Amino acid sequence: MKVNSVSLFLRYADRHPEKMALLNPGKKPGTFGDLLTSGEGVRRALEQGGVPPGGMVLLTALPGPGLFAAVVGALACGAGVVLVEPFMPVKKVEEVIRTVQPAAWLHDAVGFFWGVRVPAVRAIRRRRFLGAIRPRPAEREPLLVPEDYPGVLTFTSGTSGQPKGVMRAQGYLIRQHEILSDAMQTWHYTDSPDLTVFPNFVLSNLASGRGSVMVPSRWRDKDLRHLRELPAEHQPVTLTSGPAFLLHLMRAGGLPGLRSIHIGGALTDNAIFERAFACWPEAHFYHLYGSSEAEPVALADARTAVVASRERGYFQTLFLGKPVPAISSRTEPDRLWISGDHVCPAYVGNEAENRRAKRRDARGRLWHNMGDRIHSDERGWWYAGREFQPEEDFQLEQEIYCWLQKSKSFIQRLPSGKRLLIGEGIGHLEEDLRRRFPVLDGVRETPVIRDARHRARLDRKKMAARAGVAAPASQDVAPEPDGLRLNPLPEGGV
């Protein structure tokens, strides 16, 4: 079957060209009509430049109307888009470009200066500045291509620091949109914008005819002030973000008009959710579980999830709810394997990660290792830590967080097996901590360092190094799974 994911966007862009599609606070909004004509300009530029269907286009631009118009244009002509984590080291970017060999490079001013640092990017012969591409009337249908043709290929650093490419093919983009819409019932809010920090949700919103308000990555107070000053028709009624942005938004005064709030991407303290419940008492809250490779995997009503987690004595919201119907799953003692139409295929450019995280069963079906330990009961799934962290250490962390009433520390195992507690605001409590938790062998005070991609997560490796503690390999990279052949389960089964 031949498809093109841009067809979803066109259904609404043709009918409502004047409707806001993308807005960065403090800047002029981009309409669906703007994205349509700018995307057609990009499509023609790529076709005239000789980029074939199935060819790859490197895109380096700040999130906003220009970037997403370029995505629309590239996908419409059957090309795939390559996005690279902006803080990836130059040598790693060089590896990515040599692996993918993009046929063209599209960039804005910031993206140009990011790219010219990399010899392999400078060597791309076809390059265009997005601001110089003229919008064109969109008079043609998107080119239909096989479902497995490249859509959006995103490279991140991965657990080991080695780049890994997550491919969202054309067919995948369509199915992910359908599953997200069904799971989160976003059709209730198609007439009003979504405030989001996740680009994949922006694409899904565009496919639904919804506008998206995107906050620049620095989350400056003036950007949040601009949000509150938006006209009524541009005020977001839903929020899709991680717990760090939710907390930042509440500290800045919040947005009173939010009616549905979707939080995922990292563990969330129960107290953050409870503060949000008080800020938006009438809003519905979703607790999302997923990953770059599959979004969503499971979801729960966040109020229910917090109550369930509190009942078990957890400091963080560990109840995940039920897997979405489109997911097949298998739980093992320390791993969760999933399969489904919106689970990304093998990684591009990282065979070590493929050996660790991908398996085919006897029927040839591909399964993905989420890297998490999941328990299940009659209510649903419970998160129990990463697969490479001993479960008793994860449970001990929850107990310590409850005692400290904060989650700014973690257990670090030494090669000898000894346990150190590393974190912020704990040095003066060492005597009390070791008396209360006698399995601790020491306490190391160090400032909190957050993960660059997931700002709610502690960067355990950097914090351990800052504390003068070398992290054993078992906490840097998950071990390779055994050669067990996986048997498929019924849809949605555990």
Describe the function of each predicted region.
Residues M20-G50, L62-G64, P89-E94, R168-G171:
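Conserved AMP-binding/adenylate-forming core of the ANL superfamily
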Residues P236-T238, M250-Y314:
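Gly/Ser/Thr-rich phosphate-binding loop
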